[in-house]
Amino acid sequence: SWGVNPPGGVTADIYNLSYGQGYTTAFGLSGTIGDEAQGSTTQDALRYGVQNHRNGLGALYIKSTGNAFNTATSSTTACGDESPWVASGSVLSCTETWLSTVHSLPYMIQVAALGAAEVKSSYSTPGPSVWISGFGGEYGYSSALFNVAGTKFEGPAIMTTDQSGCTNGYVGANAAQEQNIFNDGTGGHPENSDCNYVSSFNGTSSAAPSVAGVVALMLEANPN
């Protein structure tokens, strides 16, 4: 929901939009972004929200920018992990936020991801529309279980709740090859015996709600 004609007429002050970017149309407002049809209706809805919600102070739309830094269209693309500049430390992104139609709209606070080292997460899509970064982490693989020492896969990810039970959610889906001992799909970790938590969540879809939560606290302290 963009906050226009919501069920029951109930609107929110803050909308977290945790989905990334698409490539159907680089410019204008046609095409599709994820499962959301983009057109004048979307632009009008966002504009209405920022002009009318919160008693005229405006709704706040917090949007994840995507995880496409390393997403190449072919194996020969000189970007991300495939970039010949990796060794010199000048890695080029495979895309930027402005190539997504929805990220060309001015009505959102767009959020990139950073990790525990307080630098950009390896996957986070860069671009001129990024306002701020939130915590997205890396991939949470254990170097004791996998040969990932010193790579992006070893960096800690985000700890969060999961679907209950060891056959459900992220833990259940990866039970055959859990990233670390906490994600043991047999319930073998004493602090996660019911598999209700996962320690390998990541992405700008994690970063955006972390920022949305901070924004909520700011509005609680200063609603005007």
Predicted regions and their residues:
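Phosphate-handling active-site elements
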Residues: 218-224
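Extracellular S/T/G-rich loop segment that most often corresponds to the catalytic His/Ser-adjacent loop
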Residues: 91-216
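Substrate-binding/access-modulating region of protease and related hydrolase catalytic domains
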Residues: 1-105, 117, 191-210, 221
